[in-house]
């Protein structure tokens, strides 16, 4: 007989998530992350992203349950916790590769971060951002004027990217969305779909008069002058989903939401 998986339950600070964790650990035990087989994240999408950033290198599959305001990356939480082991056994994996971001700031400092949803550049003041865009070392747009621009993964393409009128990308398509944010010029440019191995480099053309910040998921860096983005070749995380509502189906369904 196969032993049940050891589960590490992580909860957001929200009261419903904390209460659910107490009930689940009483039922299934409370295992430390380093000795667990599976991570169960209780909260919303923000907490899921936080969990991936903090523990993604552990290579533990993550099964999320929605106890927050937004739960696109989560499964439904059910009051009957007795079926959790069956759900985990039936769960289907989704493999996500984050974006790697490298930044140079106006002060000369360097920084880096990962993003599972998107990397977005935004103007810091009322002045529009002026940016250039290079793809694999070739300048594709010499000057983009607008509020900003972003690069989104397939998993993140239904979030901020979609709100900015970017395309929804199928999971496993090995593509990225390059989407301008409120572009003024070029007027007719509405973004591009890139191969996942494309290196994207943004340069801020007037960083003193028109400062720009960059955010990788929730990690913001201000006063940037150059940002380079590529899909990570080393890091990959595994999310687990109920088969009747897996991530691929959710992304597909978003394209027909009315």
UniProtKB/Swiss-Prot annotation:
One of its GO terms (cellular component) is cytoplasm. GO terms for molecular function: ATP binding; metal ion binding; NAD binding; NAD+ kinase activity. Its EC number is 2.7.1.23. It comes from the Bacteria. It catalyses: NAD(+) + ATP = ADP + NADP(+) + H(+). Keywords: ATP-binding, Cytoplasm, Kinase, NAD, NADP, Nucleotide-binding, Transferase. Its cofactor is a divalent metal cation. It is found in: Cytoplasm. One of its GO terms (biological process) is NAD metabolic process. The active site is at 45 (proton acceptor). NAD(+) binds at residues 45-46, 117-118, 147, 155, 158-163, 182. Pfam families: NAD_kinase, NAD_kinase_C. Involved in the regulation of the intracellular balance of NAD and NADP, and is a key enzyme in the biosynthesis of NADP. Catalyzes specifically the phosphorylation on 2'-hydroxyl of the adenosine moiety of NAD to yield NADP. Belongs to the NAD kinase family. This is NAD kinase. It comes from Xanthomonas axonopodis pv. citri (strain 306).
């Amino acid at each position: 007989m196969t032993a049940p998986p050891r589960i590490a339950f992580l909860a957001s600070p929200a009261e419903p998530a904390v209460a659910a964790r107490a009930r689940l650990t009483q039922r299934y035990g409370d295992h430390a992350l380093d000795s667990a087989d599976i991570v169960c994240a209780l909260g919303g999408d923000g907490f899921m992203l936080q969990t991936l950033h903090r523990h993604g290198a552990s290579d533990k599959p993550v099964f999320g349950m929605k106890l927050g305001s937004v739960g696109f990356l989560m499964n439904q939480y059910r009051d009957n916790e007795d079926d959790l082991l069956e759900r985990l056994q039936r769960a289907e994996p989704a493999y996500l590769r984050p974006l790697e971001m490298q930044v140079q700031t106006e002060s000369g400092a360097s920084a880096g971060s990962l993003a599972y949803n998107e990397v977005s550049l935004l103007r810091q003041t009322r002045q529009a951002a002026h940016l250039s865009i290079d793809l694999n070392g070739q300048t594709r747009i010499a000057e983009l004027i607008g509020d900003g621009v972003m690069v989104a993964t397939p998993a993140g393409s239904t979030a901020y990217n979609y709100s900015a009128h970017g395309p929804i990308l199928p999971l496993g398509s090995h593509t990225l969305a390059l989407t301008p944010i409120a572009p003024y010029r070029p007027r007719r440019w509405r973004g591009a779909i890139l191969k996942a191995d494309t290196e994207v480099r943004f340069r801020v053309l007037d960083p003193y008069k028109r400062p720009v910040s960059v955010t990788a998921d929730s990690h913001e860096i201000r006063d940037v002058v150059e940002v380079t983005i590529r899909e990570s070749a080393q890091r990959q995380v595994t999310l687990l989903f109920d088969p009747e509502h897996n991530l691929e189906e959710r992304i597909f369904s978003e394209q027909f939401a009315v």
